[in-house]
Amino acid sequence: TTCFVMEEPEEDAADSKPVLRTEIALHETPLVINDTTWYVRPSSVTLRKGKIGIDNFEVERGSQYVHLNGTVSQDVTDTLKLDLNNFELGYIFDILNIENVKFTGKATGQFNICDLYSSRMLSTDLVIPDFSFNNVRLGRLNLFSEWDDAQRGILMLGSIYKNDSTWTDVSGYIYPVRTPEREP
């Protein structure tokens, strides 16, 4: 359901024009992704004066879910938080159309987005117990990653644990944005 509301300007506002606010209410509905039924839970999205507010957006399937809450705007302090629980990484790589590498495994943790319109401060803190890289199962991955705006890539720092006494530290970039110097 979508509702458009014309707000009168505040009396002390320098800009005396009315403001259009858009309120979107999402209702519970099934969603099929790769032949699997997920459920979109009730939530709301508000658009007003360049701000996008997302309240309690959730897509879930049993114990697996993606939960999105927060605000995207020009204000660098506004944050959008994405919580993952047992969420298959392969879906994310398919959606982002990242073909050079293939990460799979069920991730649990947080993804934070700030200052999306400028420096794009994006970061993750994830645990993937059954992590695979290019179809090779490696073990449990503890991963921190963040967007590096200067590199136009995602810096990934983590540790992969095969067992309690064997692990590998990983560090590197993924470049999801094509630039002339990265053309095939």
Features from the language model and the residues they span:
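Interface amphipathic segments
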Residues: T1-Q110, Y117-P184
